């Protein structure tokens, strides 16, 4: 007897793994895929990801569907009977649901051959360091290059049955931010003989609050958030080093350039003002998610005409998603899928309504069959 969608989701929820470490997840999915009829399936692996091609009856084009695979470094607090078995790891962004929906679609089309070719993409490392771009550039992917591509992301705030998306920009440009400061440590009783990097970091964090408000057009939008400050070893030792970690998010590419330029100027000022050395690392950078207008309009029209579906034309979000790299080269779209839970993405208590699994699979089967 084949597992239900809920069974699959719960099995995946128990084994969350970080980016490019999704070995158990890959093995579990491959076992599921191998249990399906193989008459028109072809399977490739890339690192910890999986590509599955479903040969269509006509095969005039290839439609791709992408699901991300990785979990987050979060200790789960849901208290569910299928809680994460990996300490300090959790599917707190819904990727367990994303994979389950993709498998549900794949299973349907393994039994019911589609008109067109389909490509199912199980992509590792969306949360970091970023799996989309290297997967897109891989030989394995380029052998099965699709003509269009689709993806979704769960939305805790919307009820089950809700689809939300928009033409054009959906998600922001994002960049990590790491700033390291190095000065001169010393005894707390002799501050004049040291260069205190805790004080320097504190000044810099305060200055960073003006980057958006005084440099970005108020009709545009940007965010600079500092999430971590590290510095010092003991209460009576002046810190020799400090580290600031944060994120930058902008709706426009120009604003991203402007924000980074301003941050670099402020860091240079800190170097002069506190006689220290500083370095900046932008870590992972994700480009914007830009929905192809023609294709997303077709999906919107389809969704609005379906009984039991509530469609919302949403605003842009500051969310980061490496699916944007696929959309840079392949026309397609992404949409929000309501999962009706009180807790947000990346929350240790996130508990999506599992009724969404069958809803999403049936909705997407119907849409794909129109292509």
Swiss-Prot record:
It catalyses: N-acetyl-(2S,6S)-2,6-diaminopimelate + H2O = (2S,6S)-2,6-diaminopimelate + acetate. CDD domains: M20_Acy1_YkuR-like. InterPro entries: AcetylDAP_deacetylase, Amidohydrolase, Bact_exopeptidase_dim_dom, Peptidase_M20, Peptidase_M20_dimer. The keyword Transmembrane helix does not apply. The active site is at residues 68, 127. It comes from the Bacteria. Pathway: Amino-acid biosynthesis; L-lysine biosynthesis via DAP pathway; LL-2,6-diaminopimelate from (S)-tetrahydrodipicolinate (acetylase route): step 3/3. Its EC number is 3.5.1.47. Pfam families: M20_dimer, Peptidase_M20. One of its GO terms (molecular function) is N-acetyldiaminopimelate deacetylase activity. Keywords: Amino-acid biosynthesis, Diaminopimelate biosynthesis, Hydrolase, Lysine biosynthesis. GO terms for biological process: diaminopimelate biosynthetic process; lysine biosynthetic process via diaminopimelate. Belongs to the peptidase M20A family. N-acetyldiaminopimelate deacetylase subfamily. Catalyzes the conversion of N-acetyl-diaminopimelate to diaminopimelate and acetate. This is N-acetyldiaminopimelate deacetylase. It comes from Halalkalibacterium halodurans (strain ATCC BAA-125 / DSM 18197 / FERM 7344 / JCM 9153 / C-125) (Bacillus halodurans).
